[in-house]
């Protein structure tokens, strides 16, 4: 039975209420946020410009869109910022209004919600445990002329796996030939060093929509900032007109402008994930009764080999919150997602997992 009402991670208020403690007493591994925290440059800019909240934001977000355009080396007219990438998901779904769409499971729940709101027929393509939850070329056969849209999360959430570029290109080519809009959710791609995603390929592929997030990499989930990118200026302009005015607050827009210039922060994050991610993965693999999938983002998918062990409940008693994946289509109560955090925080989770799993054998 689910512990919480929320369908997402990061629900520390409800988890803390279950324990009868303050939320700041809980160590949260359920939300995939950069543990280095907000860049100092962003924090300083917000503090120095607090008076901007006394004015309406620029309705066109000119400076933010220019900063994003410089960052990706594309025209600003290709970009539409939103109140977190989740808004961009709903914006592109309502703007394209597909009649039939495929979403890959397990995957982010908001694709289905956004499509359901517009009455779209949803077909689910299930990743297989036998394939290590990796996307294979079998999906190409599911791309048929009656489809309007395909949602892909690259890297996938919750598996953290990134499909091979050759396969993604084959999918993009088939979608183009069949006039299918390909929506690529690249919310976590910034965590993968030197991985540019599909934005550089958009010029000749107006059927591809790339969704990005600044929330996770720059640790600003409370501000909310995401954006979509597409090379069809007219289509983006149409969505811009349909978007709610002032959907991005002034502080979030400023944070985005400043964060994108902080290359030192990017390098520091890559260094942390390269070192700590590998160490944490290896340490988890040494624990009994756990299967750990080698994701490339800042989180890992785990499977507990004992269905009667509720790791989320057990760890919560030690004031640690992890993400149960039982509500992901295609997964069940054996699966969990954990963020990769600082070395000290990861050690605390490892110690708690040892306490739960050590001494328990499959024969018990």
From Swiss-Prot:
Keywords: Cobalamin biosynthesis, Lyase, Pyridoxal phosphate
EC number: 4.1.1.81
SUPFAM superfamilies assigned to the protein according to its UniProt record, in alphabetical order: PLP-dependent transferases (SSF53383)
Cofactors demanded by this protein: pyridoxal 5'-phosphate
GO biological process: cobalamin biosynthetic process
Reaction it catalyzes: O-phospho-L-threonine + H(+) = (R)-1-aminopropan-2-yl phosphate + CO2
Name of the protein in question: Threonine-phosphate decarboxylase
Organism encoding this protein: Salmonella typhi
The encoding gene: cobD
